[in-house]
């Protein structure tokens, strides 16, 4: 008996909607999207970061329903969430740990891009949008850290906003404008709460733009070579959706461990003390994901110099597609760059450690050397390596 292979007629309602709003065609494009066939699990990190963003938005919206953005009630409202709101402790810990997990995924995502040359032509704008997302994440996380209104929240806000006073002529006016007064107080807290609620949705818009740029030229791959024929690609679904779910499983196991066993491991105990403008903590430190930049900030005696270097350490990433002069993308075929990459990763970890230490003695001295190497890697090493390195022969196909 012959099987009827006549194609099914599309649902009339779906067809009517899709003709006017092509969401079903868009979903079909995603499932049939051709990707390089040799992507490793490191390419899961983008999807993991997307899941982390969704978790942050959902938990953040629910927490905002119970939070009171007032200096007299903010700390108490957070404690009320922990004690009186059904599963409030779970929501808060998921949101707090989720921020760290989000940054961990994004840092690994950036590191993968650095290793495999994902910033090189024709993906420069894809890289730039990614760095803008990273900057927006940093602003969102900083404002969120202020909201519990503990000691570290208050003094962290005071220290970081005071950095703008280093700007000649207009710095003091900018700080007063940011504070909404002459010190960190209720107007500051309200502004930070409002912006902390808004910025994640801006991140979502930027992520959509990031995906549009990604689909224009497709994903990079471990070999760093362009796709030359259809046999070099496979559909995203089901091959990479299944792979993504494996990554999600590992991610959620680590996530759950921190939520249920070490929820405060990545935080600071001083933030469980209500904010007191009259008592300065012995050691003011930001969250762990800001520590490398904090170490660079403190490495320079001049406030203006420290601020310029701190922001410069991020903005230098925008110049990366042109600073790296090599025509080869992947570090797998660049023996000298591969060594430089791992030295740079070690330097970043060292800066992270130094940022969490007191600003005294050998810590400051080592921070200066580490900060110098950070900029040396981008501004000196990369252009010279690209010019003089002899890369290994590239394969003809994936």
From Swiss-Prot:
Cofactor, how bound (note): Binds 2 heme b groups non-covalently.
The keyword Heme belongs to this UniProt entry's keyword annotation: yes
GO cellular component: plasma membrane; respiratory chain complex III
Membrane topology field: Multi-pass membrane protein
Binding site for heme b b566: 109, 210
UniProt keyword list: Cell membrane, Electron transport, Heme, Iron, Membrane, Metal-binding, Respiratory chain, Transmembrane, Transmembrane helix, Transport
Binding site for heme b b562: 95, 196
One GO BP: respiratory electron transport chain
Cofactor names: heme b
Other notes: Heme 1 (or BL or b562) is low-potential and absorbs at about 562 nm, and heme 2 (or BH or b566) is high-potential and absorbs at about 566 nm.
PANTHER family, sorted: CYTOCHROME B
Family, similarity comment: Belongs to the cytochrome b family.
The protein's name in its UniProt record: Cytochrome b
């Amino acid at each position: 008996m012959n099987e009827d292979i006549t194609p099914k007629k599309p649902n009339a309602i779906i067809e009517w909607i899709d003709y006017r709003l092509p969401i079903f065609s868009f979903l079909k494009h995603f499932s049939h999207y051709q990707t390089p066939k040799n992507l490793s699990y490191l390419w899961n990190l983008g999807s993991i970061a997307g899941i982390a963003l969704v978790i942050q938005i959902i938990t953040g919206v629910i927490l905002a329903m119970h939070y009171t953005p007032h200096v007299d009630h903010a700390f108490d409202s957070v404690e009320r969430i922990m004690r009186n709101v059904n599963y409030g402790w779970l929501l808060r810990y998921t949101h707090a740990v989720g921020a760290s997990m989000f940054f961990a995924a994004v840092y690994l995502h950036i590191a993968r891009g650095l290793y495999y040359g994902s910033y090189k032509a024709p993906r420069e704008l894809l890289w730039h949008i990614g760095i803008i997302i990273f900057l927006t994440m940093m602003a969102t996380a900083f404002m969120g850290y202020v909201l519990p209104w503990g000691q570290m929240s208050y003094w962290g806000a005071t220290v970081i906003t005071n950095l703008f006073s280093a700007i000649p002529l207009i710095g003091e006016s900018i700080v007063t404008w940011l504070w909404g007064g002459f010190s960190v107080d209720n107007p500051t807290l309200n502004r930070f709460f409002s912006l902390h609620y808004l910025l994640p949705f801006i991140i979502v818009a930027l992520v959509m733009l990031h995906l549009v740029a990604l689909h224009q030229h497709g994903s990079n791959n471990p070999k760093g070579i362009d796709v030359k024929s259809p046999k070099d690609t496979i559909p995203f679904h089901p091959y990479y959706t299944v792979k993504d779910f494996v990554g999600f499983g590992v991610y959620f196991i680590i996530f759950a461990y921190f939520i249920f066993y070490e929820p405060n491991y990545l935080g600071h105990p001083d933030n469980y003390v209500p904010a007191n403008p009259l008592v300065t903590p012995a050691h003011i430190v930001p969250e762990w994901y800001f520590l490398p930049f904090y170490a660079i900030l403190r490495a320079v005696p001049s406030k203006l110099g420290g601020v310029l270097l701190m922001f410069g350490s991020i903005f230098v990433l925008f110049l990366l597609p042109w600073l790296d002069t090599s025509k080869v993308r992947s570090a797998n075929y660049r023996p000298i760059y591969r060594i430089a990459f791992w030295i740079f990763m070690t330097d970043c970890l060292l800066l992270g450690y130094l940022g969490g230490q007191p600003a005294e003695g050998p810590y400051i001295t080592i921070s200066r050397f580490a900060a110098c190497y950070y900029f040396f890697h981008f501004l000196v090493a990369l252009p010279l390596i690209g010019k003089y390195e002899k890369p290994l022969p590239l394969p003809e196909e994936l």
